[in-house]
Structure formats: C-alpha cells, structure tokens
Amino acid sequence: MRSAVLSFSGGLDSTTVLAWLIRKEFKKIHCVNFQYGSKHNVYERIAADAVLKYYASAVPCELTYEVVDLSGAFTGMESSLLLSGGEIPEGHYESSNMSQTVVPARNLVFLSILAGMAWSKGIENIAIGIHRGDHAIYPDCRPEFHKAMDTAIYLGTDRNVNVLAPFLHMSKSQIVQYGIANNAPYHLTRTCYKNQPNPCGKCGSCYERLEAFAENNLIDPVFYEEGANNG
C-alpha cells in the first residue's frame, strides 16, 4: 500500500502535493501541520483545516491529520517570518530582501520529524512541496538539499523512508497548472506571509502566487486586502 506523511501548511504548494498524492493513488496520507512560531501560522492552520475538511469525504484513501507544536524550536533565530522577527519584506519573490524570510534549517527540522513519524507508523514516504521558485532564496529547498536529505533519511531509517518532492523542478506557474487540472481547492489555501486575515498581495509569497495564476490566464480565487490584485 503506497503511503506518505505530508508536510502540510494549507498553502498552495502543499495542497497541490496532496492533490498529487491522491492522483497517484496513495492509499494512506498523514498530513502534518507545523506550528513553529511564524507570523502566518494562525491563518495557515485555518487553511489547512479547511482544505482537509474539503477532502475528507471526497477521496478514496485514508486521510489523517496532526498538528505539531514547534513554537519554541526556532527561538533566538533571526527571520522576519517569525513572530520575534522584523517586518515581512514586500516585493518580488526572488528579490534579495526576501532572504530575510529564511528560517534557518526549517525544512531540515521538519523532514527529520516527518521521517521519525513515517518510520514509526510503517509509512514508506514523506512528501514536501519545495519547488524551483524556492531555490534562489531558501537553501533547504534546493535539489542538492533534497538529494542529501533523501539519502540521510533513507539510511537513518534503516532504508525504510524516502523523501518525495514531486515539484522540485517545477515553477509556481506549472504547479498551479497541475493543481487546476486536478481540482485542488485553491480557494481555501493560504500563501501570504503576513499576520492578517486577508492576504496582503504585496509580500514575495503573494506576489509569486498572483503571478503564477496570471501566467495561466486565471484569477486567483482568494480575496486579497484592498489595493491588491483581488480575484
């Protein structure tokens, strides 16, 4: 039985990975939402709950969900993405100022926890939504990191767990294209980095998302704050 533990934020990328796992007929999918002290964690959690509720009665697989509290794990680390950090920068996703949003070793920590969960549950894969657009900014989203972690986790779990990153070499636009074709509920997802009810439409993450929909000649179905490019 194909199975996976998925790092699930409720964002566009992880929701599309969930759609991919369902399309690939994984029979058991355990979604894990990490609450790690980021500015947008509260709204990500709301989105994650909504997406999983949407899928719960509509998919032919065992779909489970867990929230993991890592609120103290990144204490003392510098990142504008964290509640303890400065303002979220605005501008294009690949702009140099977006490096302020790097949370040191975040995916290293997440994947290690997911690997332990998978091994203990007898699940042979863990999945993460890293993609080509992340490579310029986030070192723990690059192909060489994925390759190293896949090897380390495979060996560290006595050859029982693999790391899946199905969109590693895809752009955000290509991810949206795949998700639309596979009925991903993008209207329920949350991408914005800011701590506010409606997405800002101005931070790098929002900018990249809006650009991806535009490149597919689509309007993003989520509502942005006044002054942003509302769908």
Description of each model-found segment:
Residues M1-N182:
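ATP-dependent adenylation/nucleotidyltransferase module used to activate substrates
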Residues L108, S112, R190-E211:
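Local cysteine-cluster metal-coordination motifs and their immediate loop/turn environment
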Residues I137, N198, G204-G227:
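Iron-sulfur (Fe-S) cluster-binding segments and ferredoxin-like electron-carrier domains
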